[in-house]
Amino acid sequence: FPGPPRSAAVAFSVNERGYFGTGFDGKEYYKDFWEYDPETNKWTQKTDFPGSARNDATAFGLSDKGYIGSGYDGNYLKDFYVYDPQNSKWEQIVSWGGSKRRGATSFVIDNIAYVCTGYNNGEYVKDFWKYDPTQQRWIQLRDITDTSDDSYDNKYNSIVRVYGVSFVIDGQAYLTCGGTPDLRTNSWRYTPAIDMWEEVAKFKGAPRTATASFSSGSKGFVVTGKSSTFRFDDI
């Protein structure tokens, strides 16, 4: 990677290419933005991210475009932007109506993007949102804490966290790792058709935060991460 080293950046993929940007090097926040072409094994710098330089944002690829939003630049944020790889242009879109946040996780199912978890000024975020690109609007879903009088969410308080990761298998999303600030290994499965979460088997690796994740076929993968001063390189 030819850009400056950094942590807490974001990435997404669109049309079989990878895109990477933002982040923090301990002194400076970044807003530069890069494209990786696996066929040529080359990085190309693209148009800078138009929001403030930041870290701990969230990102996803959706309908041949990429999205980056929320994060932290010294203040908590919830602004959102869409990137079109065809012309390397950015456009600001409407933000969700809920909390600002850093360290959220996002996933895409059936061309709908979902954003949940994170941290906002001393509180772990409980609101949960989906973005429909055809309507260009955010829709609020059920909270990820025990806020209703019904029994379905009695255990939901263990969903909230910051720096968790998610991946999608067969139309369902899986959330694991992260912390509150105690590190978590409990894992949850989300079914969008009924807007419900179900607790599943715990993550078997060492507890960690700031991990990366992806899915391939019928399996999900969690890689790297940290616990206090220890850094992981297992998968």
Each language-model region and where it sits:
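Kelch-like beta-propeller repeat domains
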Residues: 1-235
